[in-house]
């Protein structure tokens, strides 16, 4: 199932690009354009902030939607698309409490109880109102089950309040589904899981209640953001974040097919770090390789030209039967623990293994059998890879370069017709070696190493910060559009013979989710071999931080 969501083509949280009817209709026309290249969508999800602040989710913003949603709903129907709508569940985000909700407003002033007052009954009538007008998918975001009025907080424990709110919503949604059996319900923020970091403890502090699967078709596993795994390519660290969260949700008991990684997001807005289509091929491949039955595509579809659209359609067609089989398995280590891992999908004719090496070394990864009836692996072929390092397959093992993504086909999928090419946006070194560089403290939150520059290769510097308790810690100098770039806090400097050396970086961005690391490279032609070279890594955080750094020699 393929869902187009227009978030990141606009952004009203970390940017100033509003949702308008013109923008929404433009993306609908792009969906139609992409059909001629073979791309298929089932749903069009209208994301956040379509609603008038005082309309109780029944009216649309007049300035941006002078005629309401009628034209959009009609155009979806005319073109065989099922429309969907975003709702902030019980949080007052860019919306005011309607009169009938006010006796549900909790002590926070911006969340509403789901088990007392008039909010939930009215909210369910809102959902039915939009279903009757043709809406077939409903997205639930920003759920806060701790919401309670002052009177309730005096008589009930927090865990009792949470349980009562969750039960009230789940039972109401079950009745809504029973009345409208063709509806799609998808859950986002607030329904369990800790999505802020890949370095957090597990099991989740906020556990996932598997009973939500009785009413929701999918649960999402976090908005795209960089992981706490440093990578020279910023977008690769984001791939690792989504992979990690899918694995953690699976470990929490969710089947892979019920997890929506929501990882594919293109756009030129703050929410997606002004990515446009950088490293988009690997992002799409991983979206389908993880095995989710709900595949959500976000952003500016006009960024997909004919060549990109045809490649997109090939991936979509390739994985359609594999996803339908529901025989996708995760294997290997945990992404956030910087261990090689992958996802394998199997049918009766063969298998595709999509494999990631998040480490700063060349690694050989064993590809496990995905089923007891699967034939031993042999005759495999690399059908997709990043540029640079050429992966090697030997029997049931594949060798990958540092930070590399690749896909290997076996059986029918080893045929040349399944070749997906090379991701040129991600360059992987053909060799990497650790340089002996001993970092020492040079004052608060600053470390430095002086070493002899190696005779070959560029120099790669990787560093990360931890708090005084040893936990990996993100710096957040402000999100877009007015925040500062993370490079103003997490800094890498290098000099040789009294001259500062240029350092190529990809991490120095305005990042709404924060960042815990820095990565940079000094090109071979910018330093002299055999002479002393000094590298300094620092954090401008006011609290004491523990910094860790490594230097590598890399050849492309």
Q: What do these predicted ranges mean?
A:
Residues 1-94, 294-296, 300-336, 345-352, ...:
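Conserved structural scaffold segments of CAZyme catalytic domains across common CAZy folds
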Residues 23-26, 63-65, 102-106, 204-207, ...:
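Short, low-complexity, polar/charged sequence segments that are solvent-exposed and flexible
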Residues 40-264:
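Aromatic- and carboxylate-enriched substrate-binding clefts and catalytic-loop regions
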